[in-house]
């Protein structure tokens, strides 16, 4: 015996596979000082040069967080510069020699926690000191022993 059904057929529902949450990184509290020592000769750098120096050091790191920093800096005009002698330590931070387009020599670029960078640089500019006071999980950028920038990296699950 056969069963005949003349009613409506059920629509097949397609369920999408559940998406796993992804950790998304972003740069926050970015402080950039182009004249950290006031009118002292030879210490002023353009924001593009500062961002390019940071980018040229961070580009050696292959993590999702560093990719977020690279994207952030490229939005601000950063371009890759020639770099050498790259080093990274989880406790000390990043370091490399970077050759600017507007200088004949290369500069030492340090990126790391305030306690480490303060030992290798002149006293921090007040804007950078204020950023440090606002967040202890901050990266400080020093170029040839002068602090030019500070930033934090935050993450959220999406």
Describe the predicted segments one by one.
Residues 1-3, 29, 34, 154:
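Generic N-terminal initiation segments characterized by hydrophobic and/or small/turn-forming residues
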Residues 13-122, 136-147:
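Cytosolic catalytic regions of ATP/NTP-dependent phosphoryl-transfer enzymes
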Residues 127:
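Divalent-cation
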Residues 1-11:
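Polybasic, Ser/Thr-rich amphipathic helices
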Residues 151-158:
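Short, acidic loop-to-helix structural element flanking the phosphoryl-transfer center
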């Amino acid at each position: 015996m056969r069963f005949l059904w003349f009613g409506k057929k059920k629509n097949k529902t397609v369920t999408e596979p559940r998406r796993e949450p992804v950790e998304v990184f972003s740069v926050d509290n970015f402080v950039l000082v182009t004249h950290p020592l006031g009118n002292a000769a030879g210490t002023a750098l353009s924001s593009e040069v500062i961002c390019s120096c940071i980018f040229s050091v961070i580009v050696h790191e292959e993590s999702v967080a560093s990719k977020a920093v690279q994207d952030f800096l490229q939005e601000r005009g950063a371009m890759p510069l020639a770099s050498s002698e790259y080093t990274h330590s989880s406790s000390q931070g990043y370091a490399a020699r970077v050759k600017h387009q507007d200088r004949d020599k290369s500069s030492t670029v340090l990126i790391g926690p305030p306690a480490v960078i303060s030992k290798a640089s002149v006293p921090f500019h007040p804007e950078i000191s204020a950023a440090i006071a606002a967040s202890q999980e901050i990266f400080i950028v020093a170029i040839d022993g002068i602090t030019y920038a500070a930033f934090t990296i935050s993450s959220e699950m999406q």
